[in-house]
Amino acid sequence: WSAGTKYGAPDNRTIIRFGEPFTLMSNRSADPANVQFSLPTMYHSHFWTAAFADLNYGKAAEAEQSGAFKAVTEAADKWVRMGVDGFRLDAVKHIYHNAYNDENPTFLKKFYDRMNESYKAAGGEGDFYMVGEMLDEADKAAPYYRGLPALFEFTFWYKLKWALQNGIGCYFVKDILDVQPLYAQYRSDYIEATKLSNHDEDRTGSDLGQSAEKMKVA
């Protein structure tokens, strides 16, 4: 910490409360463990598994009533009021514990609808854009179109990578077209957000053997 400060408090009765200022202690011997947080279990959800959710929104069907949902949307509203007309959502399958039941799509629809309302109230034209990163094959990602208008197309990249690595392109178009009816089951106006690799995967250049020709085709 600058000027030798660190988090600390005079004793363990000191509580940090939302919206109230807290002064950093300049004494290096101050014990950080003395600092308590008011209502620490309101937002955080502890599953204690290898993959657990970050925030406790309660039941997905009632998520909008939770303090966590209200805090997140209020923070997002500030960006909308400043002119932002879309969000990219990371790791949308990890909001609730089970990535493959209806909880995450249910939550995402509530979040999207709420932000779309804010966008229109701020004078936005058309609909708010929101794209989710659902890192999985098309059949697993498709149900997430119930909640979001756009999803990153991991299957597109998987099929394209295979075609370029093997020099076989005769299946590519069919493979991509075959997944579209699947998406349409969940959303008629779905948006396939085309991508190559991202930060969670080996990069495109590495997957394609640093071939400039293949990278240009991709």
Give the label of every model feature segment:
Residues W1-K70:
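Glycan-binding loop/region signatures in secreted carbohydrate-active enzymes
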Residues K59-A60, T204-D207:
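Surface-exposed cleft-lining segments at the edges of enzyme active sites
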Residues E62-M82, A212-A218:
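Short, acidic/polar
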